[in-house]
């Protein structure tokens, strides 16, 4: 993502779709400091930074680069 573009906020369903993880796993990773925490935009609503989620995806892909699955 270009740094000149404004950041968007994502709902949990969009975050789950993008990263392929469920709600429980996302919140477990947040507690472990391994996934970006959401921002409280209202007392009842949390949203994730699109840029932070994209950066996490890139970090995960970089961590597995060169490692192929064996069957």
Q: Language-model features: where?
A:
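Short, solvent-exposed alpha-helical "recognition" segments
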Residues: 32-39
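Short Lys/Arg-enriched helix C-cap and helix-to-coil transition segments
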Residues: 39-45
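Short secondary-structure boundary/hinge segments and terminal tails
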Residues: 34, 47-48
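Short, charged recognition helix plus adjacent turn
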Residues: 64-71
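Polyanion-binding surface elements
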Residues: 1-25, 32, 51-52, 58-62
């Amino acid at each position: 993502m270009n740094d000149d573009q404004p950041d968007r906020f994502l709902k949990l369903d969009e975050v789950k779709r993008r990263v392929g993880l469920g709600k429980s796993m996302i919140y477990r990773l947040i507690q472990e400091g391994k996934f970006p925490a959401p921002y409280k935009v209202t007392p009842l609503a949390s949203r994730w930074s699109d840029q932070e989620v994209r950066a996490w995806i890139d970090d995960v892909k970089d961590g597995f680069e060169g490692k192929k699955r064996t069957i």
